[in-house]
Amino acid sequence: SGSCTTKTCWTMLPNFRSVGDVLKEKYERTLQVEPVKAKRTRRPTFLKVKDSENYRKPRLSHLVFLHRSPNYCEFDENNGSMGTVGRRCNRTSTSTDSCDLMCCGRGYNTHQYTKIWQCNCKF
C-alpha cells in the first residue's frame, strides 16, 4: 500500500506576558557583581557577587550588573542625562509619559492652556 506518515514538530514560545513577568521578577532581584582575577595564571577571571565575603559566584539563572545605572530623573552632564525637571507629562496617562513615572515622585504642577485657531469650517 502506498500510504505515508508525516510527523511535524514545532516549538512554541511561551505567552509574552509570562516572559515579561519572569524578566521583571529577575530584574527586581538583580545582583551586583565584580570581576575577580584568578590567582593562578591559567584560570580565567570570574565574577563574584559584590560584598559577599566568600567569593560567591552568581548562578547562571541570575540577572547581574557591574555598575548601578545613573539616576535619569536628575540632571547629570557626565552621563548625558538632562533629567526630567520641566518636561511635559500627561497626568492621566499610564504609559511612559505619565506624570507619576516621569516626575520620579517629586510631584508636578498642572497648567491649563486654551488654544484658539481657525478651523476653516464650512456650513
UniProtKB/Swiss-Prot annotation:
GO terms for molecular function: signaling receptor binding. InterPro entries: Wnt, Wnt_C. It is found in: Secreted, Extracellular space, Extracellular matrix. It holds the Pfam family wnt. GO terms for biological process: Wnt signaling pathway. Palmitoleoylation is required for efficient binding to frizzled receptors. Depalmitoleoylation leads to Wnt signaling pathway inhibition. Its main location: secreted. GO terms for cellular component: extracellular region. Glycans are attached at N79, N90. Keywords: Developmental protein, Disulfide bond, Extracellular matrix, Glycoprotein, Lipoprotein, Secreted, Wnt signaling pathway. A lipid is attached at S1 (O-palmitoleoyl serine). Disulfide bonds join C89-C104. Ligand for members of the frizzled family of seven transmembrane receptors. Probable developmental protein. May be a signaling molecule which affects the development of discrete regions of tissues. Is likely to signal over only few cell diameters. Belongs to the Wnt family. This is Protein Wnt-7. It comes from Strongylocentrotus purpuratus.
